[in-house]
Amino acid sequence: MPKRKNLAKILIVIAIALVSLPTRAETPKLNIKTKHGLPAEEQRKEQMERLAKQYDLKKYTITRDISIERGAMNHSSPVLTLNLRFLDNDDLALSAYVHEQGHWVLMERLRAENPRLFEDLQRSFPNLEIRAPEGDGELRSSYFHIAVCMLEWHAMEDLVGPERARKVIEWKQRDHYTAIYSILLNQREQVEDVLNRHGVKW
C-alpha cells in the first residue's frame, strides 16, 4: 500500500512538471519586410520576430505578410503595415499586431456577415462619436473597430494575461479610438454578445 501511495505521488509530480514546461511557440513564419531599410525599421522588424518566437501567434496570424514603415499609420490591408511606435513597449507592439490581424478576421472570414454585424453594432451602440480621437473618422469602420478592438483584447488576454491586457486597453482608451475602447471597458459583456451573435472570433 505505501508503495502505491509513493507511486501515485511520483506520478502527480511528473504530471505537474509536464504541465509546467514552457510550450514552444508555433507562430507561422512571418514575411516581414522594411519599407526603407532604416535602422529603426530593422529594430521594429527584430522586435516582431522576437515576439513571434516568444508567443504562439498562430491563432492570431491570418496574413503573414508584414511591412514595417516609418511614418505610416498602422493599417491592415492590402499589406499589414506597422509603424515604429511602441519600440519600447512589447505589450503595445504586440497589441498593434493582433489589432491589425483582427481586421483580417472580418475581411477574410466574415465578409458576408459584415453588413449584419454593422447593423447590430450600430443598433446596440447608437450615436457613437466617430471623429478622431474618439473614432477613426468614418462611420462604418468606427463601428467595425468595436469588433476589431474586442478581438484585440481577447488575443492580448490569451497572450499576456488579463491584467497586462487590460492595462493595454486602458492605455489605448486614453490615446486613440477613445470612445471605442470606452465601450469595451464599460460594456464588454454587451459587445461580446453582439460578436457571438455573428460568429466573430479568432
Map each language-model feature to its residues.
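Post-HEXXH active-site segment of zinc metalloproteases
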Residues: D90-D91, S95, M107-H145
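N-terminal signal peptide c-region/cleavage motif recognized by signal peptidases
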Residues: S20-P22
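Surface-exposed patches in mature extracellular/periplasmic domains of secreted proteins
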Residues: D56-I68, A112, L159-E170
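Short pre-active-site segment immediately N-terminal to the catalytic Zn-binding motif
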Residues: T81-V98
